[in-house]
Amino acid sequence: ECAVIAAVGVLHWLVGHRLKTESLTGAAAVEHAFAERNILHGVWYFSGTLAVLILRKPGSAIFVNLVGCAAEMVLGNSFSFGFIFFSAALQGLFAELPFAVTRYRVFNLPMAMLSGLCTGIEYGVYLMLFRYQGVAWFSPRGIIHMISEVVGGVLIAGVFSWFLYIAIAKTGVLDRFASGRAVRFADRQQAVQPLD
């Protein structure tokens, strides 16, 4: 578990470093890069959805995000300690909302996508309030920002997390967790079904 969490922290740091070192010219290039960056924000918050899919316990997304942020901070970060930890806790909370509504009983692709959607909306609003204060909500840039966050949330934090979870579970690494055993059991059931 700790190795996965640390890997998420390193991934966050690498993506953040890449996004800060790009140089762009021209208004169209800036808007395109702005949308691309916001879609890629899903890399920062996919860990919450993945944590809930694997651990299936209340608070797991918040815990994993906070520990991942601690790993990112150890490697070095240009943001303040409080900014990062507050953001990580909010992302974890919103990643857990759809699963909490079902009392942590439904774990499937639509739930993962809904989790990514909630986190994308949360992070989009968070950035508008704390990082992009000069951007009007209904300006082209504000609309592009929110749409990009939602798309990134659904695709990266939702769909990517689901298929990553399935791929990891099929290796047998997660057999000590109920989530891993469920995937392996479903695979065995499909293997024994006769062909019609």
Predicted regions and their residues:
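Aromatic-anchored segments of alpha-helical transmembrane domains
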Residues: 9-17, 66-75, 116-127
